[in-house]
Structures are given as C-alpha cells and as structure tokens.
Regions:
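FAD-binding subdomain of flavoenzyme oxidoreductases
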Residues: 4-7, 11-158
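Short, intrinsically disordered, charge-balanced linker/junction segments flanking boundaries
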Residues: 16, 193-199
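Flexible, glycine/charged-enriched surface loops at secondary-structure junctions
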Residues: 7-11, 163-192
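Short active-site loop/helix that positions an aromatic residue
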Residues: 1
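A conserved active-site cap/scaffold subdomain adjacent to cofactor or substrate pockets
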Residues: 144-176, 197-199
Length: 199
C-alpha cells in the first residue's frame, strides 16, 4: 500500500502475539486508534450455522467469486478474480462515525466498548462464533509527517484534562494514543527487551 500512499487500519499491529487482520475485525480491535476507531466492515466472506442448524457460506464481500461454496472458496484461495469482479456496494468498510463519537466527551457511554451493537455485522464483532475467510477494509492516506509525544504526570486529573482538550478542541485527532501506568513503564525499562527484539 505504501506505493499508493495508503495505510491499513492498524499500522501498529496488536498487543497480542500472532494476531491477524481477520481476528482484529472479529474482535472489533483498535482501542488505541483514536482517529480510525475499532476495526469494522460489512464486507466479508464467512461460514456459519443458520437457524435450521445447517452450515452455510455467506458471501457479503461483494466480489464475484462464483456460485457454489467450493467454487467461491477455490477462486478466493487461488486469487482467480480481477478488478472487474470487485463490486462497490453501499456498505461500510470502517467505522465512519467513530471520530464524532470519540469527540463527544460528555456522552453517557464510552466511544468504544465490547459488544457494541452498532458495530456487530457479519464478521465484525463475531468473536470467533463464525468461520471467517476474507474481509475488505478501508485504507487511509499516509500522513506526510508524524510526531510522537510522551506525556508523564503524577496526577491522573491532568491526563483527563489533556484528553478532553485534545478530543474536544483539536482540529485533527491523534492517530493513536495509549496509557501506560508507572509500574508498566518501570518494568519495561528492565524487562522484555528480548521479546521486543524477537517481535
């Protein structure tokens, strides 16, 4: 994607070793992604048990891969499709409301929480209850410049004030943001260097 000046939903990967893109969609992952929000798509290919107890293949990915389940999965695996087979229906491939929700610092509910019914659709938020074969997700324009800021304080109220100010008043939201408590920071200074190198 770099050659197109684009980025995927997450460029930081996951806090879980071995996590996958599909797994991220299944769990609506992306808690640190302030600007893009949790992984979400309405375009996916998956198998599930229907209300009659029968295993079925659901092709919501909007790519013409054939008619039968075997044909669809074979063409997907062997990449037997072209741009002409790809359709662009009026469906979401990201959470297009998240920025508005995360800026609402006075809301009664958090911007992101588990099992948010607003973002449960097909593979999105399925939490492993179906077998997902493929997903389509939006990409994002790569920023020309980025800057990382580390902010430390002994007063949690100071962080709350900074967070509210950024979300309410900044023209552009941060790409991502993460909290580390003191014990975590102190431990990282001494431990886990080998894990970092391996990953």
């Amino acid at each position: 994607m770099l050659s197109y000046g684009r980025e995927p939903h997450s460029v930081i990967g996951s806090s879980c070793i071995g996590a996958s893109i599909v797994g991220g969609v299944c769990n609506n992952s992306g808690g640190a992604l302030v600007k893009r929000g949790p992984a979400y798509t309405e375009l996916s290919l998956y198998a599930k048990i229907n209300s009659k107890g029968k295993l079925i293949l659901v092709n919501d990915i909007a790519i013409d891969l054939g008619e039968t389940p075997k044909e669809i999965l074979t063409n997907l695996q062997q990449r037997k499709y072209s741009e002409n087979h790809i359709k662009f229906p009026d469906k979401l491939a990201s959470d297009n409301e998240y920025q508005q929700r995360v800026r609402d610092v006075k809301a009664d509910t958090p911007a992101r929480f588990n099992s948010d019914g607003r973002r449960l659709f097909g593979a999105s938020g399925c939490a492993g209850k179906i077998a997902v074969f493929a997903v389509r997700l939006d990409t994002y324009i790569s920023p020309k410049r980025t800057q990382v800021f580390y902010v430390g304080t002994n007063n949690q109220d100071a962080f709350a004030s900074i967070r509210k100010n950024i979300l309410s008043n900044f023209k552009n939201l941060p790409i991502s943001g993460e909290y580390l408590h003191r014990e975590c920071y102190d431990a990282a200074k001494k431990y886990s260097k080998d894990t970092f190198i391996v990953i």
